[in-house]
């Protein structure tokens, strides 16, 4: 993969880099200002001792003249100076004595004043640059491609057979999103959301180890059950074409489990089908397969799971970069070519594999890799927290921690640059999700550490919707409805929120600029310390976890879910290590 950077990297790019100079450049500049200011003060003070064209006597020569006034050379110098400057040597020494004292008093004051002026100027420049950056992100939107009145007229005339389909991807509806209601049933952070194929049910998984299946319209749970996991449930998904009878789940304990649901609205049982040696954050479903799916874990392993087999899981690939394993946070199958899948994790590369062509002896089995060129050799520890294919598989969206969201063309060659970039949010505190919204993937939606939900128009990269989504401070999960203009979200709060375009007027994006400024400042400050994912917020999570630990313990009853015999189907050891099972649930690490 090419590691060349664009030739413009050396210039100050507000969109791609920091708004201010590096600390080393700032300190060097201030030292230069101090040195020059000291010279200016000395020259101005000493110039008072002469009225001639000279820049002022040298301090060493002044001392020599004061100690040896009998020499002929000094007399000649003194005579000539008296003729030109009208001062005697003694007068000159007195003047210099006073000027030295004044200089010692004035220099610190001048230095402080210049430092203050320099800081004020730098602050003013940074603020102006930040304003320019925010303005560039909130410019006027282009004309919408879909308008309600002409579309309604066409439907009346029978010339538009796909009115609902087109309306769901219209900007005007997205700009009218408002909170409809919340679904309350969990006692911990809600880490995963997934609609069934018909869009009638919504599954949610939580730190409380439960999975709830909702009738989201009636605001009632259809069923809830213990997942069988021993730590935070990170994902729960309906397998397609299974009659909503099978749920696949993964969690922080590294287990991949399958739940069988009955028509009587209860969970018959759950069983473990795979075991990672680290947390498993994401599952990847094949669009039409009720039996097969993929899982990825922080152990860098991708499992392919076929429920028709006696031993369902088999190791597909171990993700590596130069013989070093790369822990994985996210995985997604290309909906247009189900042989291909993409993964992302603890480095800056999006990796695409083809299940038919994986040869770990050749390029570690990777078909191709993508990465924003400015991050290829960056010292910042970039991680991919989530990636997702568009509806037709032509585009690939990747969200980076403490960076931006990037759109790649999945058909481009290895090492290709991104084609779009989406900015304004903050992705630092958790493994945050990102998604497309709209039947044709017209929009990009992401949560943020500031507790807001951001929606960008994919084509223009402009923010078109901005909603307060979580009182706890972080929005992690965003799940679009498969057929309707509805969005489900969750985060640190213990409920699920349902959004629909029912507002009387389009959003005015109130407070957006202030939030963008705050997110940008915090990100720039954190980038100076090069903190790794989770480090800056781990203490906060641990404290939050300890406050809820006693409340969660009552859900950790033995004998729930799969029995020990079920674990025999795991491709790895059935005895998980202390590292895998021992830690209590850490609050809201996933999306």
Curated annotation (Swiss-Prot):
Top-rank lineage group of the source organism: Eukaryota
Subcellular location, record wording: Nucleus; Cytoplasm
Motif Nuclear export signal, residue numbers: 39-50
Basic and acidic residues bias (residue ranges): 1-14, 65-99, 118-131
Pathway: Protein modification; protein ubiquitination
SUPFAM superfamilies: WD40 repeat-like
Keywords carried by this UniProt record: Cytoplasm, Methylation, Nucleus, Phosphoprotein, Repeat, Ubl conjugation pathway, WD repeat
GO cellular component: Cul4-RING E3 ubiquitin ligase complex; cytoplasm; cytosol; mitochondrion; nucleoplasm; nucleus
Entry-annotated residues carrying Omega-N-methylarginine: 198
Residues bearing PTM Phosphoserine: 21-22, 99, 123-124
Region Disordered: start-end pairs: 1-140, 552-591
GO biological process, one term: myotube cell development
Pfam families, per the entry: WD40
PROSITE patterns named in the record: WD_REPEATS_2, WD_REPEATS_REGION
WD repeats: 185-224, 228-269, 275-315, 323-363, 379-418, 426-466, 470-509
Family to which the UniProt record says this protein belongs: Belongs to the WD repeat DCAF8 family.
Quaternary structure (record): Interacts with DDB1, CUL4A and CUL4B. Interacts with KPNA1, KPNB1 and XPO1.
Function of the protein: May function as a substrate receptor for CUL4-DDB1 E3 ubiquitin-protein ligase complex.
Protein name: DDB1- and CUL4-associated factor 8
Organism listed in the record: Rattus norvegicus
